[in-house]
Amino acid sequence: MSAEQPTIIYTLTDEAPLLATYAFLPIIRTFADPAGINVESSDISVAARILAEFSDCLDEDQRVPDNLAELGRLTQLPDTNIIKLPNISASVPQLAAAVKELQEKGYAVPDYPAHPKTDEDKAVKERYAKVSGSAVNPVLREGNSDRRAPKSVKEYARNHPHSMGEWSQASRTHVATMKDGDFYHGEKSMNLDRAREVRMELKTKGGKTIVLKPEVKLGEGDIIESMFMSKKALCRFYEEQIEDAYKTGVMFSLHVKATMMKVSHPIVFGHCVKVFYKDAFAKHQKVLDELGVNVNNGMVDLYKKIEALPGSQREEIVQDIHAVHEHRPELAMVDSARGITNFHSPSDVIVDASMPAMIRLGGKMYGADGRTKDTKAVNPESTFSRIYQEMINFCKTHGQFDPTTMGTVPNVGLMAQAAEEYGSHDKTFEIPQDGVADIVDNDTGEVLLTQEVEEGDIWRMPVTKDAAIRDWVKLAVNRARESGMTVVFWLDTERPHEAELRKKVKAYLKDHDTEGLTIQIMPQVWAMRYTLERVVRGQDTIAATGNILRDYLTDLFPILELGTSAKMLSIVPLMAGGGMYETGAGGSAPKHVKQLVEENHLRWDSLGEYLALGACLE
């Protein structure tokens, strides 16, 4: 990328965005070329990343470059311009399907070892872990997030409002979340006084020390956490909520993020499935274990694997699963016509998309009969789920939002350098034995943070870099100055991590000229209430949030304001000086692909690409 010829790198990804790219990218090049702008493509699809990871298994002419690693390198250069389209954050079933498809095309990549038995299997699984989940975003997002609805898009939504379901004060829809034993209640935080190198280790009750992560390099001023979720508390919570939904006659739905949180949330998802179907699973445990059934991958894993059984045995298992529903609540459906439930696959119901859709529909989801119904929305982790309950309370009191008059809620998100939980995948572990989980300084042996944990608990260590926090505060002030909008930092005083963040935000705001700006810091629930009260008055409010709330709110408000999150302008000013421009905040729209196959019609809206291209050319 020389100064003589500006270059835009346009990513090739997956599903609907990739199909749209075949039509749109040639047009971009046709207009860019006479202007002296070079437009290069870079394939970071799931398939390309699998092939790059296992190039040693391929013939010479089948090998592809590691484009993701190269893009990661380019984010550190000051003149980089990347247009990034949505890509699949592959769940295990999606990853396994991609592997099978590649093998059928003649690529000798290894099978995905769901249950590794040998060291070789474990090594292969570790390599596939680099491709699964949100493997792309932590590499490319070397800056914080600026997401907003462009004025023209907002005005169009006001003049041509999308459909919105009616809210009733009698709605029984509510969020169910853990009151103890989750990450929120099991969190400790520390602001580092100096640069350190630490390890994560488990001291078992039997006296053995297991090093789970031998080395994590940390800088002065970085914030680290030790947080865990109790398996016992989680399963107890599920049983209580399933029983409550059955007794009260309300539909049951589970909302997690098993794609992005690729280590922790498939486990959280799987425990719910196992508790729900515990009678059938207990009866057939031996054969299900022999088949290697893993419902962390959804009920689809069970149905696929029992296909290998004799017909009568298979039918008995299916009948026993169906019999469970006689004393369990109705399940929310992903596809009522095809009988696909909330438990089919962990990637089917993703909290940041499913909760806004439910709220837009008047607090309802679809049941088995194809009708919309009130639901118990189970969000196990309470850290962020309370904001949804606050919005539900607001809607029950004030009614549905009006797209023709409501204000807008842009977001400035703390995202750079794999901030917070979204960067913790390589530091997240399912505890193998009861013991004490410690974060230890490698040089001094000092235990920085410690937790008592039990077998099956999920323990993780998020890291938030001081430089990323400074840049986030700067971006929030800049957006306040440019837009004239009020900014609210959503930071709880009761959560240890956010208490540390509040201190830094207050300190770093002093580095900027904030005269004439309205900048506030509020706990999450207060911030939601304050923002909603302004929204219904047509007032605009920038939400400055951490990484998970960035993800949640940049779906929640656009879906209510615009009908979709795909029409957002999503800019990532890279900390090295370049820019990454994400095309909206939506996903890769697999249903669009299904419709294309069935009807030969692609309904993908490329407005996000146009917006990103415009910002990139500027």
What are these regions (language model features)?
Residues 2-270, 278-504, 508-618:
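Extended, well-ordered protein cores
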